[in-house]
Structures are given as structure tokens and as C-alpha cells.
Curated annotation (Swiss-Prot):
Gene designation per UniProt: RXRG
GO term, biological process aspect, one: nervous system development
Zinc finger intervals, NR C4-type: 139-159, 175-199
Region (Modulating): 1-138
Gene Ontology terms: cellular component: cytoplasm; RNA polymerase II transcription regulator complex
Subcellular location: Nucleus; Cytoplasm
Protein name: Retinoic acid receptor RXR-gamma
Post-translational modification: Acetylated by EP300.
Disulfide bonds: none
Amino acid sequence: MYGNYSHFMKFPTGFGGSPGHTGSTSMSPSAALSTGKPMDSHPSYTDTPVSAPRTLSAVGTPLNALGSPYRVITSAMGPPSGALAAPPGINLVAPPSSQLNVVNSVSISEDIKPLPGLPGIGNMNYPSTSPGSLVKHICAICGDRSSGKHYGVYSCEGCKGFFKRTIRKDLIYTCRDNKDCLIDKRQRNRCQYCRYQKCLVMGMKREAVQEERQRSRERAESEAECANSGHEDMPVERILEAELAVEPKTESYGDMNTENSTNDPVTNICHAADKQLFTLVEWAKRIPHFSDLTLEDQVILLRAGWNELLIASFSHRSVSVQDGILLATGLHVHRSSAHSAGVGSIFDRVLTELVSKMKDMQMDKSELGCLRAIVLFNPDAKGLSNPSEVETLREKVYATLEAYTKQKYPEQPGRFAKLLLRLPALRSIGLKCLEHLFFFKLIGDTPIDTFLMEMLETPLQTT
């Protein structure tokens, strides 16, 4: 029927042959599909039959069909016996026939099969796994926006939490329908059984949840061990012993006041600080690990913090004094006397920011000792040979103080933070005191570095 049409085809001069050659040229359908070039022989379709699988393999997938520069024509009466392909620029017009049609696509539904495995899950509405959807990170379970890859699958926080709870609590669900419930963003909470099954089908791993729990437990145990080792390495009992060893007995002072001295308040404070500077070195030697530092670093730390350390001591000693401070010599310095001497502003700061706060929270000796140890171990002091070691010691004191407050004052969860808030005020007041030259006459003509070196080299006196 189509013999005359399909047997011979005339091409323009020079196409597929030698230059200047004209005449009839025929081509094999299979050759045309495989090479796109005309053949020199003139067989009929019956000479070289082409099977249906070969023709479909030439077409391949819809992407191949759309990407090909040729138009493939097949017969709808049965398996096509051949196909004609036209090179670019040449139009082939099929003879009028209702029995010919153009195959331009392949049904996608025939190529994609439902996921094998669990019964009823094949009918669920699975999100697309095309490259575009992966870029958007859609939850593979319900289609909501993904927050990342959880337990091996891109999923939202809701599905992640649902799967984790199911595994950790070893929950068992049942489906009220046919185990094929639709799981999407709006209906993901309707059936927990089908949601959990879909989590498994999409690739969520039970062992990933168990490993995460094990890692969390190991991390918590490690942190607890570090904290315990810090407490053992910097025991609060030794810090308290250091405080008690150098603090004078205040009960022997009685009701002594500034009237017992003819000196002005500034001179009295300087004399008291002079006396306390000797005991300050003894106190530092009793703090755990301070003596393990190099002698040069010990001098640097004491030189950087001695004013704050002394101010903290007499501030805490003065919590029982009304409107004044109690010096280590047993003398009281009243607010009015300080104002008369021209140092009223800094004196007021000591009373309001330190003495009053210590009194309100009833700061004990152990807490005072820890705060002073934190001041002593200052990793920012200039000239330290090993600031990281000093920082490690300070962190140990932090851990010791926090553990102590939690154990001693469990009803005050914010006590540790309140204690640390006194440190900035102490630092600011200490700098202001240096500006007022309070302590510049402490040791006469002896340079403070020389004095500290001599004191630190003196063996610790044990009682």
C-alpha cells in the first residue's frame, strides 16, 4: 500500500552522495534512525524488517524523543515495521491516513511503580524526589518545609520529633483504616501508624536515634566528670581555710572607732592596707595551685589584683557596720569622715555596691574566698608567661563556686550569677581607689615588685 511512498525518496543534489550526483535515493528505516544518513541501497521495508523493540529503543524515553532532531512516524495498526527520519531542514509529509499518528511521549505512569514492601503504603502521596525538590529540601514524610537531614532523611521538625519519640519510647501504633492513610502536611497527625511506616519507607533509621541518645548520655557523663574533677582539684574547703587563716579576729575590736586615732581616714586606710598586704601574700600561697605557677607569674598576678583583693576583704568585714567600714586594725571609718577627707564619692560606692550587696545576700566566707580567687587568677594580667594555665585555674574556681552555691543554697538558683555580678563593681572601685592614691604609701620606699618577690620566696608559715 505504501510501497511507492516508502521505497524511494528524492534528495537534493549533493545530499548523502558525491557532488553533482542526482537521482533516486532510498534509505533503510533502521539505518536512518541509527545514523541519520541515507543509504545507497534501495531495499523495500520487507527486505529489512524492523521489530517493535528496536524502533522503541531508538525513541527511548520521552527526553530522547524530545531531544532528537528527527521526527519519528510510526503506524498505529500494530508493531511498526519501520520509521522514516528526515534530516534537519527537510520536511516529510505522511500520506493522508487516519491510521498514522505521531508518538511524541511515553506515559510516565507506566514507568514509575509504587514502592514495594509494606502493604497499603503504595497508595500514599509521596513527595517528589526530583532534583528540584531536593534543592528546596521538602520533608520526605509530609511534604512540609524541611529543616535539614534528620536520621538519614530530609524532614521537618514535626516528623523528626515524631520519629524520635516513637523510637525512644518504643511506641506501638495501630491504624483504624486499611493502613494506607494519606500522610501530608495537613493530615500527618491523623494516623500515627501510617506516619511511622512512611518514616521507615522513606529511609529514617532507628539506629540513628539510638546512637544520638548514646552520644548525649556520654557527653553528659563527660561534662559531669570534668566538673567533678574541677571540684576535687580546687576544693572549696581549702579556699575557706585560706580565708580563715589570714582574717583577724574582729570580735576583739569591740566598739573601737575613728575617735581612737588622731590620723585622718586616708592615713588609717593606708596603714590597715599596709598590714593586710603581708597577709595577702600568705593567703595567695594557700590557694590551690597558685604556688605551682612560676614566681614571676605569681608576682604579676598579685601586682595586678592586690587592690581589689584588699577592698573585697574589708567590704565583707564591714557588713555588720552601720554606715562605715571596719579596717583590719580594728578601726571604723564612718561615711562622714570619708566625706570630710574628700573621698566621699568612692567611699559611698564601696558601701552601696559592695558592702550593702554582700549584706543583703548574706555572702559567706567560702563565697568571698572564691570571688577573691577569681580576681587573683586573672589571665588578662600583662606579662604572664602562661595565661592559658591561669585561665584554667580561674575556670576551676568558677566550677567550684557554682557547685558550692547549688549544694549550699538550692533554693536560690540565681545566687551564683549574683555573686559574679559583684566582680565588675569591685574592678571599677579598685581602679578608682588607685586614682585616689589610697595605697601608694603602703611599703615605704620599697618597690612593690621587690616586696612581693621577697614575700613569695618566704616559706609559708603553717599553724
